[in-house]
Amino acid sequence: VCPAAITVATAIARRLAGFGGAALNFDYAIGEGGVGDSLQAVRRHGKHGVLQDPGLADLSAHVDFGAIARAAREAGAVVHGPMPQGELLERLGIQTRAEALKRRATPEQSADIAAAMERLLDLQQMGTLFKALAMTAPGLATPAGFL
């Protein structure tokens, strides 16, 4: 668990509970109960050695959305999720939006849209590796996609 992430989530949740509003978070994450070392490096969209080429690769680790959700609830916010990014985007109509974009796209743009959709939704890519978590003020409707 990252103490700074809990501090930030608590501050956001308190603000939402006190003043209203909503927050939507997407990140490379685990859900409830995940434990372990998830530090990794990514370079040019591929796995890379964590200590190889310092400064030239992006370092990341799974966010513990379960811990963030607990902290947000304790601070007074209503928590929705976490859920896989792909599932949320599907519920929000990403397929319909992509088809609308493709109707006015060049063949090259259409191929780019298809590739982006695969990356965002595929179960082996960002579709399940990334999670979505929403926090809302008490009394607000459940955010679209989280119903």
What are these regions, as identified by a protein language model?
Residues V1-L147:
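Long, Lys/Arg- and hydrophobic-enriched amphipathic alpha-helices
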